């Protein structure tokens, strides 16, 4: 054993032992309770960041603690390897996305291995490998058979210069991110999955999940179950009687309708624009810019009057129809009723275009004014109908019922439940993704690829150039024969949304070598007992994976309907930021390692200079580590300097897992110093610790009893904290243990060995390398087996027993000392000891005790 703790040597030795023993390869075992813990698989971007380190360490700590407690634990890893960043990198570097992706996987896998993670690498998957995405294609075809997958036209962002479809995030201020061209909206055929068919189940099943309430609320809002009324405004056009249908949750305000707005893509807008160039021009303008709902919510609301009116279904009054750029064809009916008196967006629109505003609800004590919008105008809790004829005086629920009944009686509509959730469009006009297994035949139309011909393999040697999908130019991929008639045909060149890849990978981990999508092993491991990932995945990934799981269940592939019982959303890792701003307002950000900070006498930062030139930089505050703010810390540099155990210890100690973690160089140094103390104690007491002498607890001296009492008392709390995932206080407990052991005077070697062994096991899940080596070197492995599977230490309840207890001694309510009495001392004995104590004699001024108050186990107060 070396005197000095050298992390690189210790970690290399431990990892060598683990590799030799294939320590983390896991099999099903019906004799043990199972625990399946999964970190959301990473995108292979090139390097791990500190957020990865924190996530995977949390998972690893959980794995190791539960394995020591007798669980059959599994921690797999894979790569979410398809996606747009690989295409962008390919264009920038002139290499195929496949090469960029596989190179990154190799590097990041090496980084993970250097962290000492308990990953079963035999289960590794990469979603860009044909043996994985074959099953994306297979399940897609099954969903097509069941009508869950279907094809319809959808609106996309089109870059007219690059001749390609853009994702919403590639549209910046209405322009293509590469070309700078004004983006257009285009309608193209795409495949969708009927997630709306599962809306009720997705909503209701949230109640049974051990997920953060915040995440469940986000999903509830995204699913967006609404109770309202679907009805139509009648009109006549081209000799036909029709209804302009809308949905509203505020039917109580129907008498306040002064206009209707329709989407630019609405069939009525198309018809009305046939002979009106100004309408056609506005429709074309609406087609430029992004199609994201968020873009629509923040952009300037514009409209144009069509000169056409529909009729109010209850009054028969004409209602003017406008085309509005804020109305989305993909939501609701593509039309909305305009109630400017009681909807903030409609109010602003009406003020802009001088449309009538009508008050039809009122709240007691409030005065309505057209001058400016007030929050209560949209209130439905306390409001009653006014200026609404027969509905006057009705409150919200009563008014909705009455209006719905009248609309139904008139044949215009009825109550309806609607959902904010929309079917999942899975077609992407991109190369680096799962090919959609469809063949286009001139005679047979769209033909599914036969199951025996799966997978449709994506060529990995193409290099995107930004001008359209490379698959459309690859004759080898594109040309095929129709499986129905044998004629020459073309393959579908769209690929699947990468959220498909991440919707079921955790099930494939359980049976990575299966010749079917999943097998019986999947029902052994799934659902995940613990899923770990960032809050940014609260909606799309987690919702899609829940939907995908339910589809797999309904197809008879699995027996469970939810992918994860419990979810932990770890907090972000934050760091200081520093920048300079030029005359044009552009900020240049500097890494904290390149900056020297000055502090005041209270340790608060008051200034900073750039090391390169000694000139000032601005303190930007603490923000999430990111490339854009250049405030990241390279985990590899940290591991190279301090070792993986120090990185792990700091990330677990600095904050509870679910809270934000503020980076601290001093905190990292403190973690390293603590591990050196653990090692130093082991080295300095190696002979005493290695001696396997037993002891009789009943005959131990006071020093031994006190040490055991302290260690087992702290162990009790540490065990509880492990169970509730409060790993920061587990580390605090270990620090208390080391202080107690290191400071124990007169403790025997046997008790030191026992208590130090407890410390090593408590620390092991957090810092596995140093504890593993100390455990082996000091002979614990010979007695208990390798630390990987050593039994978790049990609290010796007898050691917690005390013959004497200490009570606070007060005189007239003020603390004057401490009183030691027998644990089972009677009240009379406690009172006698109190008045006999020196503290009473000193602070009672010779006065006798009038009253003695005894609070059992806590204090004695003598009143004089």
From Swiss-Prot:
It catalyses: tRNA(Leu) + L-leucine + ATP = L-leucyl-tRNA(Leu) + AMP + diphosphate. GO terms for cellular component: cytosol. It holds the Pfam family tRNA-synt_1. GO terms for biological process: leucyl-tRNA aminoacylation. It is found in: Cytoplasm. One of its GO terms (molecular function) is aminoacyl-tRNA deacylase activity. A motif ('HIGH' region) lies at residues 42-52. InterPro entries: aa-tRNA-synth_I_CS, aa-tRNA-synth_Ia, Leu-tRNA-ligase, Leu_tRNA-synth_edit, M/V/L/I-tRNA-synth_anticd-bd, Methionyl/Leucyl_tRNA_Synth, Rossmann-like_a/b/a_fold, tRNAsynth_Ia_anticodon-bd. It is an enzyme of class 6 (ligase). The keyword Nucleus does not apply. Keywords: Aminoacyl-tRNA synthetase, ATP-binding, Cytoplasm, Ligase, Nucleotide-binding, Protein biosynthesis. Its EC number is 6.1.1.4. A motif ('KMSKS' region) lies at residues 624-628. ATP binds at residue 627. PANTHER family: LEUCINE--TRNA LIGASE, MITOCHONDRIAL, LEUCYL-TRNA SYNTHETASE. Belongs to the class-I aminoacyl-tRNA synthetase family. HAMAP family: Leu_tRNA_synth_B (MF_00049_B). This is Leucine--tRNA ligase. The gene is leuS.
